[in-house]
Amino acid sequence: MVGFFRSGFSLYLYCLLIVQLMIPAHAGDGGGMHSGIAGLLGDLEQTQWEPTVSGSRQALVLGGRIRIEDCQSYPYHDNSHGTEGFLKLADDLRHGLGQGLSCISGQGPAGSLHPYHERNAERLIDLLNDDSGKILACVEDQTFAYAIAHPAKNPAMSHEVLIDTYRISGFLSRRFERATYRNFFKLSEPLIEDHLTGKPVHFDGLHRYRDLPGLVFHELTHWLGYEHTNLTADVVDLYEVCCFAGSDHIPDDRVNEGFQQRACKILKDAELWDADEATRKQLWHDKGYYRLKREIRRASG
């Protein structure tokens, strides 16, 4: 899909490391943010292989602090090419952070958002730069979402993202009861048997996730403590829709661009983001912003 962010953004990321060298030391906050993002991305270019805790497998470590484990089949569970999956996820992580952090800090094509979001960019950079454990791990058909983020509850626990390579490849889960395949998915008994014992079923209507950098940034945003809701501003969804060309589920670029622009407009609403939590919840309802998520879901089919 094409949204107004995708054109030329790869070139923007390549230039980001160069731009920081051209900004004077006395530049304003924008220069500091450019430098912070570029510094983080530069650190994450440094990779090394280390054994996992059990010692039976290798993990790819980025910047000495972010571990990628069990991702040889990333992005799809039936693709296995040695180290290729690890390196692909590392690239998606860097790309997603570059695009997402630039966007929410007001340095991207959307222009300035409310300062609330620049503070979130700073918080995420600080989190990714600290020494707390951070793990991106891949699983197969073990979640009912494309990916799940687990924020650390205390300093002794790691921040973790589980990416279901089975789910994002668009395959029907094998974790349901036979009656569910028969009654809900309307599969015949022979097809149920083939699905459970052979190659899994892939329907045209099942979504194959495409914007993987956006998915990774979406999950990392959960590490800031945000959860999904429609009772108040869903920060995670707003960031993904505004910063990554709309919803990954909508093939119509024109419709998607409209949703993207609406999300960015919400992120610029000073009245909403200046408010305390209780007032923001009321404004979210009064301004009709809650309708955005519902309309995106309807447009996704």
Across the structure, where does each feature detected by a protein language model lie?
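Predominantly extracellular/secreted Zn2+-dependent metalloproteases
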Residues: 26-213, 223-301
